[in-house]
């Protein structure tokens, strides 16, 4: 029994994170030098994301009996994303107004160094709905795969899947090739995941070594407030949605515990995207639903990021004594409903969206971003964890609504009745 515990990815990642924290704290310079380990692991995962999405979506759509169900799944997913993201934005707004973490700081915006956030404000000026929609269309198919743009790959995969489905029996050879290729890709993922403890160790050692635990103290109230809000959202909002759908949020979190630890170590929810595709199929969701909901959710269903955006914007207003009445906050909410979709998939998207929002609202100082630039790294874990749980719950909800969920399989997997619960599966049945 002990041997199986020590060999489990869950234990190995947890141990790696602990060792990384200790190394970063006691030997900060050495901890900073561990950064390539974390970066390397995330790059390996990103290398495989595009082919995983392509294979999953194409085989899922091409293997469906009716194309009507694809449109129904997409519409249900987008409606769910918008409703739950709005709830996340509102919860962040309510909590930051009640706790008021920025009140009393009395920061003069003119004294802030805006040069540190100039790169984000410059990118923010280029964001918008039309540029975002145009960016979904790749200049070339090869370019979409080379850049790793999730939405571009998803668009091509959906079109390819539809075309393959229309070929009928003539397309079976291509379908079989892609399905076989999918098995190979998931085999590669299994190899990469063995390096997860090393990646988590390197990323955590670097974070603690560079920023130190002491940096959390100065703006600790905002960090604590944000973490508690994310916990509140997961267990109250997502927990209620899960209960209404017929499963326990606690059992689901236990089911994806390894993925959560990897995200905690790397601060990147993308690091477990391929593995989540596997696990959501294994839990009973049909491949076509998983292939559409998970990749799309990584751009449109960022619950943790939504909470962060409203809290950060109002915190800056409080810290700089910028007046925000109820109408200003409603305006902020409306702007965020649009802008939060505009920088999806962009590196540093949280800051870019926040900069764009502050500029759009007008009366909030964009230079105020400098206040949270230093602690943003410590809030990224909560954002990524909440985003991951939110996308997992969304997949099950949409699958059940579209009658593409095996509820007996869901109950068995979440209850741990399947002994191979955490084993990687090369492919899932559609």
From Swiss-Prot:
Q: Where are the transmembrane segments?
A: 8-28, 44-64, 76-96, 144-164, 184-204, 222-242, 289-309, 326-346, 352-372
Q: What is its main location?
A: membrane
Which Gene3D superfamilies does the protein's record reference?
Sodium:dicarboxylate symporter (1.10.3860.10)
Q: Which GO terms of the cellular component aspect does the record hold?
A: plasma membrane
GO biological process per UniProt = L-aspartate transmembrane transport
Alphabetic keyword roster: Cell inner membrane, Cell membrane, Membrane, Symport, Transmembrane, Transmembrane helix, Transport
Q: How does it sit in the membrane?
A: Multi-pass membrane protein
- Coiled-coil segments: none
What family, per the record?
Belongs to the dicarboxylate/amino acid:cation symporter (DAACS) (TC 2.A.23) family.
Which HAMAP family does the entry link to? C4_dicarb_transport (MF_01300)
Protein name in UniProt: C4-dicarboxylate transport protein
Organism this protein belongs to? Pectobacterium atrosepticum (strain SCRI 1043 / ATCC BAA-672) (Erwinia carotovora subsp. atroseptica)
């Amino acid at each position: 029994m002990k041997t199986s515990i020590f060999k489990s990815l869950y234990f190995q990642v947890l141990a790696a994170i602990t060792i990384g924290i200790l190394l970063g704290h006691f030997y900060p310079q050495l901890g900073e030098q561990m950064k390539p380990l974390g970066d390397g692991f995330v790059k390996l995962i990103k290398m495989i994301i595009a082919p995983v999405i392509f294979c999953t979506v194409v085989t899922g759509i091409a293997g469906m009996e009716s194309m009507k169900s694809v449109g129904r799944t997409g519409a249900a997913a987008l409606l769910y994303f918008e409703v739950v993201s709005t709830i996340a934005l509102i919860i962040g707004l309510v909590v930051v107004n009640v706790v008021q973490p920025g009140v009393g700081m009395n920061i003069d915006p003119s004294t802030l160094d805006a040069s540190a956030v100039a790169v984000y404000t410059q990118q923010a000026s280029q964001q918008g709905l039309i540029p975002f929609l145009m960016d979904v269309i790749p200049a070339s198919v090869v370019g979409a795969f080379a850049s790793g743009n999730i939405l571009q790959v998803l668009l091509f995969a959906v079109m390819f899947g539809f075309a393959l489905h229309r070929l009928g029996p003539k397309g079976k050879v291509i379908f079989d090739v892609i399905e076989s290729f999918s098995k190979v890709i998931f085999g590669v993922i299994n190899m990469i995941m063995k390096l997860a403890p090393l990646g988590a160790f390197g990323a955590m050692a670097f974070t603690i070594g560079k920023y130190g635990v002491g940096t959390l103290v100065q703006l600790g109230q905002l960090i604590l407030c944000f973490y508690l809000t994310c916990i509140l959202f997961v267990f109250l909002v997502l927990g209620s949605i899960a209960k209404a759908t017929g499963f326990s949020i606690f059992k689901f979190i236990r089911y994806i515990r390894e993925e959560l630890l990897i995200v905690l170590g790397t601060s990147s929810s993308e690091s477990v995207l391929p593995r989540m595709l596997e696990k959501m199929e294994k839990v009973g969701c049909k491949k076509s639903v998983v292939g559409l909901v998970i990749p799309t959710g990584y751009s449109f269903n960022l619950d943790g990021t939504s909470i962060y955006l409203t809290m950060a914007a109002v915190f800056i207003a409080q810290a700089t004594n910028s007046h925000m009445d109820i109408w200003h906050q409603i305006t902020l909410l409306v702007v965020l409903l649009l802008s939060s979709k505009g920088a999806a998939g962009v590196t540093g998207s949280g800051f870019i969206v926040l900069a764009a929002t502050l500029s759009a609202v007008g009366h909030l100082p964009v230079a105020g971003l400098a206040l949270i630039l230093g602690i943003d790294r410590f809030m990224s874990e909560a954002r990524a964890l909440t985003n991951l749980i939110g996308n997992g719950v969304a997949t099950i909800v949409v699958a059940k609504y579209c009658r593409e969920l095996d509820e007996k399989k869901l109950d068995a997997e979440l209850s741990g009745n399947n002994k191979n619960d955490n084993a990687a599966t090369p492919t899932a049945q559609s």
